[in-house]
UniProtKB/Swiss-Prot annotation:
ATP binds at K242. Its main location: cytoplasm. A motif ('HIGH' region) lies at residues 47-56. The gene is tyrS. Coiled coil: none annotated. Residues 353-419 form the S4 RNA-binding domain. The lineage of its organism: Bacteria, Pseudomonadati, Pseudomonadota, Alphaproteobacteria, Hyphomicrobiales. It comes from Methylocella silvestris (strain DSM 15510 / CIP 108128 / LMG 27833 / NCIMB 13906 / BL2). This is Tyrosine--tRNA ligase. It is found in: Cytoplasm. GO terms for cellular component: cytosol. Keywords: Aminoacyl-tRNA synthetase, ATP-binding, Cytoplasm, Ligase, Nucleotide-binding, Protein biosynthesis, RNA-binding. It is an enzyme of class 6 (ligase).
Length: 419
């Protein structure tokens, strides 16, 4: 991307200034389309779980900003591609899901989007479509003859998603090898049906997306464009959206609103400014002001981040209730005054303290083997959330007002106080 490029469209100005852009095939072309008011763009979401988590939130926000700046977003549900499995970023083959599971997952994922974008038949109203509509209707021989002949196996083998698996001598099934062909075909089909000219996604999808551009050119489609967002990690390098309790889900039935609010409140100081730009709609000058706060004042910025981000996912009322619950729990000292505590070096949490070791250190269990038994029985909790994975580690995202609450059963609790 050219550093001299100055976008004229509100869409690209917003994405560039707020940090959403990693790679782009043609900034000038996308800018012109956005200025014309004719930009239709999509992002695909495979149905591998009953909810999306905050790792997908950057992409959802890109669709939201597209709509707010006059474009038309398409949320593509991968009812067809999920049956194959995307090998991108994976060390082993994905588990094959039943059609019933895929449908149930699709319903859970679809419920997220109405919180962020408006659906309907209007020019800028969003569409939700499922690639199973066309992929499951394809005839194999016809697809090979009409579409497959345009793919170069040489180029496919050079894709990171393929090359890394082969270099590590890890199996890559023929099923997964075909995934990029289906994703490329999705782009062409969405162009034919809805005039979609831009595919967006995470940086790990760049190879798949530009394959779609190439296929469109070979099949005579109009000019198509690609744009990806950066891989999102915390300032300490941890994968975005992971805590000791697991993924930070967007659906309330999989993660309480209070825990969602706490996730944002507990972000690292160095992440506050970046997250305010990406996950809220606060004016940029306000995000800069909040980012510049130091000392204890940075906690006020984190509360604003938490409430704004939670408002989008769960509504303003629920966000304010979560904020008040946190105030009563942590700031009025309800926990600190009544529970035993031990001091722990903040560097241990920064490095990722194993949850088994943490419970031993807190004196709640005598050994890691006892901790494992308690986890199997649902007896260990971190910040009142059950620990399901014995390999989990406590991280900065688990810290609330300088403490982490560990519980054995319902009656034994210890606070880890960071020093």
């Amino acid at each position: 991307m050219s550093e001299d490029f100055r976008p004229r469209s509100d869409f690209l100005q917003t994405l560039l200034l707020r940090g959403y852009v990693h790679q782009c095939s043609d900034l000038e072309g996308i800018d012109a389309k956005a200025q014309s008011g004719e930009l239709v763009a999509y992002i695909g979401f495979d149905c591998t779980a009953p909810s999306l988590h905050v790792g997908s939130l950057v992409q959802i926000m890109m669709l939201r900003w597209l709509q707010k700046t006059g474009g038309k977003p398409i949320a593509l549900m991968g009812g067809g591609t999920t049956q194959v499995g995307d090998p991108s970023g994976k060390d082993e083959s994905r588990k094959i899901l039943s059609l019933e599971t895929i449908e149930a997952n699709k319903a859970g994922i679809a419920s997220v989007f109405s919180k962020f974008i408006a659906f309907g038949d209007g020019k800028t109203q969003a569409l939700m479509v499922d690639n199973a509509e066309w992929l499951t209707a394809l005839k194999y021989v016809d697809f090979l003859r009409d579409v497959g002949r345009h793919f170069s196996v040489n180029r496919m083998m050079a894709m990171d998603s393929v090359k890394l698996r082969l270099e590590r001598d890890q199996e890559l099934s023929f099923l997964e090898f075909n995934y990029m062909c289906l994703q490329a075909y999705d782009f062409v089909e969405l162009n034919r049906r809805y005039g979609c000219v831009l595919q967006m996604g995470g940086s790990d999808q760049w190879g798949n997306i530009v394959t779609g551009l190439d296929l469109g050119r070979r099949l005579g489609a109009p000019q198509l464009y690609a744009l990806t967002s950066p891989l999102l990690t915390t300032a300490s390098g941890a994968k975005m959206g992971k805590t000791a309790q697991g993924a930070v889900w967007l659906n309330e039935d999989m993660l309480p609103v209070f825990d969602y609010w706490q996730f944002w409140r507990n972000c690292e100081d160095r992440d506050v400014g970046r997250f305010l730009k990406l996950f809220t709609e606060l004016p940029l000058d306000e995000t800069v002001r909040l980012e510049s706060l130091g000392g204890a004042e940075i906690n006020e910025a984190k509360k604003i981040l938490a409430t704004e981000a939670t408002s989008m996912a769960h509504g303003r009322e629920a966000a304010l209730l979560a904020e008040e619950a946190a105030r009563q729990t942590f700031e009025e000292g309800a926990l600190a005054e009544s529970l035993p505590s031990i001091d722990i070096d903040a560097a241990e949490i920064e490095a990722g303290l194993g949850v088994l070791a943490a419970f031993v250190k807190a004196g709640l269990v005598a050994s890691t083997s006892e901790a494992r038994r308690q986890i199997k029985g649902g007896g260990l909790r971190v910040n009142d959330a059950p620990v399901a994975d014995e390999r989990a580690a406590l991280q900065q995202g688990d810290v609330a007002s300088g403490v982490i609450k560990l519980s054995l059963g319902r009656k034994r609790h210890v606070l880890l106080k960071l020093v």
